[in-house]
């Protein structure tokens, strides 16, 4: 059996999975794991395989050291990159800018182009690039593929993609709506026509990726026409720690009146806002407990979250003209029954006949939570970004081999 090693490299961590690209979305990967606290005195490498977990706590000075140690632990249990057939290494890259609309076989030139995009994603692309460079050195004989979070949204209509600011400034500094969570939105949106038993080219849908980060997308006939995140993942819905859309004048006000620096405002809006900024927590399970205990801040945070979500659902229903399906995915979207119910409350006049009993069913399988005769079908579809990356990477790797590059 052939596998793809999927890597998601952060500034102080590396998540990894060995995935069969032919598997289904609910199948367990052969290996999953995490290298954490890179550069800190107390790091750890965790490897899960065959229903068992193996964890080693140690200092991890670099990404290279941590990933090499992870491969060694995998090898000790017969599932290392040299023990099984690995046909590709797929790398999640957050920002592809205008340069990348499709996955790319990684060569030195592609590395340089990803580096050129660092100003658009200063927190994410450097870490993604570190992971690419480390993995290419450790596994030089295997094709490496970059899969970009922004790629799915790269051809949105100009009216949705561009901001109403000076053209010259926007062009000079690459300012536009790029969108994020693209791999997830694309993956989920491809499952919906199968559930509807419809041609993908004739489905209008809204996808809602609701995790700690959250985004919405309007997709017409397989192509996105709008999305909630923008130049950065800060825009759009209220999220776990991010503000989502705000009046840009708030930034000037905080600078002038509070004397806050750009970095301080950046930290406030990205890490100390959203649900956490209002309620003090961003775990929706804890938030629900506090709401049940009549915590007013928790109730306010939840209401703002739902209000923003309903605003985008309504806007995208208008943008699409006809909506065949609304789909919830990611941690909150897949597991929080009340978020799903409250976000679609009292929308029967718009063709949404919500099934409260179906909504309460717990399952890892895709499922419908509207009634059978609802004009707009509502689904819960578990996302699997790693599988999507594996599938895209396997395809690019196959073409590279056919071209004699490997």
From Swiss-Prot:
Cofactor(s) of this protein: Mg(2+); Mn(2+)
Textual note on the cofactor: Mg(2+). Can also accept Mn(2+).
E.C. numbers: 2.7.2.1
Keyword list, A-Z: ATP-binding, Cytoplasm, Kinase, Magnesium, Metal-binding, Nucleotide-binding, Transferase
Main EC class the enzyme belongs to: transferase
Residue(s) at site: Transition state stabilizer: 181, 242
Keyword Kinase: yes
Listed pathway(s): Metabolic intermediate biosynthesis; acetyl-CoA biosynthesis; acetyl-CoA from acetate: step 1/2
Localization in the cell: Cytoplasm
Domain of life: Bacteria
Family, as annotated: Belongs to the acetokinase family.
Protein name, per record: Acetate kinase
Gene: ackA
């Amino acid at each position: 059996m052939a596998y793809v090693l999927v890597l998601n490299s952060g500034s102080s961590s590396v998540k990894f999975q060995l995935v069969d690209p032919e598997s289904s979305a609910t199948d367990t990967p052969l290996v999953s794991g995490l290298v954490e606290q890179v550069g800190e005195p107390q790091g750890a490498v965790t490897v899960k395989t065959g229903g068992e977990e193996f964890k080693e706590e140690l200092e991890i000075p670099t990404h290279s050291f941590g990933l090499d140690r992870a491969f060694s632990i995998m090898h000790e249990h017969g599932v290392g990159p040299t023990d099984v057939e690995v046909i590709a290494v797929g790398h999640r890259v957050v920002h592809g800018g205008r340069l990348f609309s499709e996955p790319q076989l990684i060569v030195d030139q592609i590395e340089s182009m990803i580096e050129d995009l660092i100003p658009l994603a200063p927190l994410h692309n450097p870490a993604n690039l570190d992971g690419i460079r480390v993995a290419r050195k450790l596994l030089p004989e295997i094709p490496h593929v970059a899969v970009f979070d922004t790629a799915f949204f790269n051809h949105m209509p100009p009216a949705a993609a561009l901001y109403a600011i000076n053209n010259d400034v926007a062009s000079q500094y690459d300012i536009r709506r790029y969108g994020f969570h693209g791999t997830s939105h694309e993956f989920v949106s491809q499952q919906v026509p199968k559930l509807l038993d419809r041609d993908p080219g004739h489905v209008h849908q809204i996808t809602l990726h609701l995790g700690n980060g959250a985004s919405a997308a309007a997709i017409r006939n397989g192509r996105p026409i709008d999305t909630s995140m923008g130049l950065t993942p800060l825009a759009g819905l209220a999220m776990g720690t991010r503000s989502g859309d705000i009046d840009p004048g708030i930034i000037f006000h905080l600078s002038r009146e509070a004397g806050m620096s750009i970095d301080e405002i950046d930290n406030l809006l990205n890490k100390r806002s959203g649900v956490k900024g209002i309620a003090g927590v961003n775990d929706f399970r804890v938030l629900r407990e506090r709401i049940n205990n009549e915590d007013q801040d928790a109730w306010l945070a939840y209401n703002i979250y739902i209000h923003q979500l309903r605003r985008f659902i309504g806007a995208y229903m208008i943008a699409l003209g006809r909506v065949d399906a609304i789909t919830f995915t990611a941690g909150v979207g897949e597991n929080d029954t009340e978020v799903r119910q409250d976000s679609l409350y009292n929308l029967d006049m718009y063709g949404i006949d919500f099934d409260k009993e179906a909504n309460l069913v717990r399952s890892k399988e895709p499922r419908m939570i509207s009634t059978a005769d609802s004009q707009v079908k509502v689904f819960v579809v578990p996302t699997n970004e790693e599988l999507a990356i594996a599938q895209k990477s396997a395809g690019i790797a196959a073409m590279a081999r056919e071209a004699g590059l490997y």
